From Swiss-Prot:
Record-level GO BP terms: asparagine metabolic process; cellular detoxification; glutamine metabolic process; oxaloacetate metabolic process
Gene Ontology cellular-component annotations: mitochondrion
Domain CN hydrolase: 44-290
GO molecular function (one): omega-amidase activity
Gene3D superfamilies xrefs: Carbon-nitrogen hydrolase (3.60.110.10)
InterPro entries xrefs: C-N_Hydrolase, C-N_Hydrolase_sf, Nit1/2_C-N_Hydrolase, UPF0012_CS
Organism field: Schizosaccharomyces pombe (strain 972 / ATCC 24843) (Fission yeast)
Protein name: Hydrolase C26A3.11
Length: 322
């Protein structure tokens, strides 16, 4: 596997913000209306597949295929699967279900075939990955030819302890990724995070400033954090950056060890929920319209009004280089 896939944006703050030279001055930047929307952003339909998985990996892959085919049949150009879609979610399962990211692996083969057969861009949720003696929570992205075009390892691990609620430590079995991931498609550039990554606004902000029009988050919030934060965070990331945000969850199974909130959701650049569902197995569809981004960014022009000269401590590496 070519290492370039593991985070298409390399570490180093300046490379995250290639066009932010204007941030070093006190002048408010003058930007034309058309430049506020990436030129490569095209309309498309997205399908979020909210799967109910089992302890049988082959069964999970077969079900994913059926639902991806269904989503494509209903006009989806971009399809998203949930976090840890090929395995039960839980630290006790990750080692058992882990695979290397290589062409001979079952999940790689299945996802590649799904993308190729449907001629869609497939954001393959995430799977437990084994690499050099470590385990990662890893997402693969395939293009319509079935080619792997991006891999994202979950950067922020889900370590929480809610009094009277859920206690969970992904770091007991997983290692964190160390790079952001952005991927170019024929519909524009996408940013990618996994579940807990959505709580860190810097990722979406960096992606948006680098021309991403959509953030994709496979995620499995639970019954404590889900009702409080799932939609809230999706809307926050969308309105913070005036971009589209799509969050794809597993369906809820109360007989499983981990209970997913479900509610896969798509939010537009105004922070409006344009498609969602409940906790049951389903497919969520949304038509992504670039003109909505244009309207949002011209109506509330935060892109021309940010004052990095005032809050430059948000970017300590840039400040140091100055």
């Amino acid at each position: 596997m070519n290492s370039k896939f593991f985070g298409l944006v390399q570490k180093g703050t300046r490379s995250f913000f290639p066009s932010l030279n204007f941030c070093y001055t006190r002048n408010i930047m003058s930007v034309s209306a058309s430049s506020l929307v990436p030129k490569d952003f095209r309309a498309f339909r997205i399908g979020l597949v909210q799967l109910a998985n089992t302890k049988d990996k082959s069964e999970n892959l077969q079900l994913a295929r059926l639902k991806v085919l269904e989503a494509a049949k209903n006009g989806s150009n971009v399809i998203v699967l949930p976090e840890i879609f090929n395995s039960p979610y839980g630290t006790g399962y990750f080692n058992q279900y882990a695979e290397p990211i290589e062409e001979s692996s079952p999940s790689y083969q299945a996802l590649s075939s799904m993308a190729k057969d449907t001629k869609t861009y497939l954001f393959g949720g995430s799977i437990p990955e084994r690499k050099d003696g470590k385990l990662y929570n890893t997402a693969m992205v395939f293009d319509p030819s079935g080619k792997l075009i991006a891999v994202h390892r979950k950067i922020h691990l889900f370590d929480i302890d809610i009094p009277g609620g859920v206690s969970f430590r992904e770091s007991d079995s997983l290692s964190p990724g160390d790079a952001m991931t952005m991927v170019d498609t024929e519909y524009g550039k996408f940013g990618l995070g996994i579940c807990y990554d959505i709580r860190f606004p810097e990722l979406a902000m960096i992606a948006a400033r680098n021309g991403c029009s959509v953030m994709i988050y496979p995620g499995a919030f639970n019954l404590s954090t889900g009702p409080l934060h799932w939609e809230l965070l999706a809307r926050a990331r969308a309105v913070d950056n005036e971009m589209f945000v799509a969050c794809c969850a597993p369906a809820r199974d109360m007989n499983a060890d981990y209970h997913s909130w479900g509610h896969s959701t798509v939010v537009d650049p105004f922070g409006k929920v344009i498609a969602t569902t409940d906790e049951k197995p389903s497919i969520v569809y949304a038509d992504i319209d670039p003109s909505v981004m244009s309207t949002a960014r011209n109506s509330v022009p935060i892109y021309t009004q940010r004052r990095f000269d005032v809050y430059s401590e948000v970017l300590p590496a840039l400040k140091k280089e100055e």
